[in-house]
Design a protein with these regions (language model features):
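C-terminal segment of classical bacterial N-terminal signal peptides
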Residues: 19-25
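Secretory targeting signals
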Residues: 1-4, 15-19
Length: 187
């Protein structure tokens, strides 16, 4: 094995430093855009909820043992398709932590305790609710007075972003977002 010259070592280290300084973090999670219309039409309930408590446990999904988190939420307001909705619902998301073991599912909605959000929900045959479109169906509310819809914390890169529900809703005031959503509900 040959020796490395001092000049070669310095050039190599400098190249590595420059590459790491100007590199961009790669993201492997990419999803197709859900339009606002598709999100509204595909949802069973569209509500403002606040997470009250959550519990993670193992569940058999597709013949594999996975961690899921069940979050008890309080329904603060029905925006659309909310007739007969209970005051509290159980919402299941993929991933979570049990003791020292954790499982993260990129692109999943993160229901944060005591943080109100707009949630586009599906209801499974088991009676549990699920966030439609994962993070594309979850919008944390920001601000005290006029609340605005924010971007979900674990939202991945979205293909065709300009036609997405995220583009249409993030930054909107809750009242105007609710009106846009209700206008898309078909009887």
């Amino acid at each position: 094995m040959g020796q490395v010259s001092r000049r070669g070592l310095i050039v190599g280290l400098a190249s590595g430093a420059v590459a790491s300084t100007f590199s961009v973090t790669a993201s492997a999670t990419i999803v197709r855009a859900l339009s606002l219309s598709a999100l509204v039409q595909g949802s069973r309930r569209i509500v403002v909820v606040t997470a009250l408590a959550s519990e993670s446990h193992f569940e058999e999904l597709g013949r594999r043992r996975r961690i899921v988190t069940d979050t008890r939420v309080r329904v603060e307001e029905g925006l659309a398709k909310a007739d007969g909705v209970d005051r509290e619902l159980l919402v299941r998301t993929l991933g979570g932590a049990i003791g020292d073991l954790g499982e993260r599912v990129h692109g999943q909605a993160q229901l944060v305790l005591d943080e109100p959000c707009v949630a586009f929900l599906l209801q499974g045959p088991d009676g549990l609710h699920y966030v439609n479109g994962m993070a594309q169906g979850h919008y944390p509310l920001r601000g005290a007075g006029t609340r605005k819809l924010g971007r979900s914390a674990d939202l991945p890169e979205i293909l065709d972003f300009n036609n997405s529900a995220v583009k249409a809703l993030v930054g909107s005031e809750l009242g105007s977002a609710g009106a846009r959503i209700r206008a898309l509900v078909t009887p």
